[in-house]
Amino acid sequence: NEISGNQVDGNLCIRFPWPGIARTIWGDHQRYKETYFTAFPGKYFTGDGALRDEVGYYRITGRVDDVIIVSGHNLGTAPIEDSINLHPAVAESAIVGYPHDIKGNALYGFVILREEGETRDHDNLRKEINFMISDTIGPIAKLDKIQFVSGLPKTRSGKIMRRILRKIAEGDFSNFGDITTLLNPEIVEEIKEGKL
């Protein structure tokens, strides 16, 4: 169903092709069709969620498959990160899930502070961040662990490497794969050393 009006969100689909669209997956055209054209027949499904604001501009809200199940609730990481990033002391954040005996998964936040946040008491900041999340999304989305970091592992195009953060949150430091292509490979060791 196509969503009309403004102030709405949903899955981002594209109706018409454009010059740079991928035409196939080498050697597996059927997989290409199943991945991008079966969820919404006749439309290209990007895999992203989007928000159309009050004036009709679109904003990508994150991957729709980037969902963590906590106590039976499906929680998208993008809305939680957006809530955290509203805090005046926060510059950027990334959320991952890690196994929890009771909830199935728990939420682990990696948070980069702005300059004014660096001098604040970190325990109070953790409480304030969780209060903001609880207020905007609900108590179920509160983070179990919040680690303050100086940076996040990113590719040269700026994509956060969540698989690395997930392994750190799980306490699995055995194999991160090739991290030499990261924009800032040294940050991985720093985050490992500060793990909660």
Where are the regions that the model predicts?
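Conserved ATP/PPi-binding loop(s) of AMP-dependent carboxylate-activating enzymes
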Residues: N1-F37, L75-T77, F173
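Small/polar loops that bind or transfer phosphate-bearing groups
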Residues: C13, G72, S150
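Active-site and channel-lining beta-strand-loop segments
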Residues: N1, D48, V149-T155
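Ser/Thr-centric signal marking residues that sit
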Residues: Y32, T46, T155-S157
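AMP-binding/adenylate-forming catalytic core of the ANL superfamily
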Residues: W18, R23-G27, E34, G42, ...
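A contiguous, mid-protein "functional segment" used to position or interact
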Residues: G151-F176
